């Protein structure tokens, strides 16, 4: 093995590998700290929903969301969104006239007015996509947090929904799985380690797995 190859492997092992390892361990420690400081399973009820499990409150969204708390911490949480609707025979879902700090009540078609033959759309027409701008839902009240939901299809887009219907979102937060960010950190660390000085190919050649290219170069010279 020539001097240049020895220098590259020495530089990678002595300088880049420890730094990459320290970076990976640091990110992992930050993740463990966020897990220890994460809140337990939290239920953010909207509009006084008393029951969020059942046919009246179907699950409309499930995914991950970053909760940014007023202390500056950012915690990855698993978010379950249930959409509860009020019907004439619905006695389970109750809508509060005095919403608390952590409530969000979406009045379907609240800012939309269409008049055909003097009838408001809130009394007559079916909901359309533009009448239900639910692409982003912000919830306040959980440690001054705000949660942005992307591509959330509102249940008010149901075929039988009317613009006069009141829809409440029930958001349930729980700590995210540990493996998601951990594997991401490991992947970044491994890619960063392998991006310097052809680290993996040099290790493979030193172990005899790959042929040494410099032998052919020396013979040709």
From Swiss-Prot:
It comes from Human cytomegalovirus (strain Merlin) (HHV-5). Belongs to the HHV-5 UL40 protein family. It comes from the Viruses. This is Protein UL40. Residues 15-23 are annotated as: HLA-E-binding epitope. Pfam families: UL40. GO terms for biological process: symbiont-mediated perturbation of host natural killer cell mediated immune response. Plays a role in the protection against host NK cell cytotoxicity by up-regulating the cell surface expression of HLA-E independent of TAP (HLA-E has an inhibitory effect on the cytotoxic activity of the NK cell). Also promotes cell surface expression of UL18, another viral protein involved in NK cell evasion. Keywords: Host-virus interaction, Modulation of host NK-cell activity by virus, Signal, Viral immunoevasion. Coiled coil: none annotated. Disulfide bonds: none annotated. Residues 1-35 form the signal peptide.
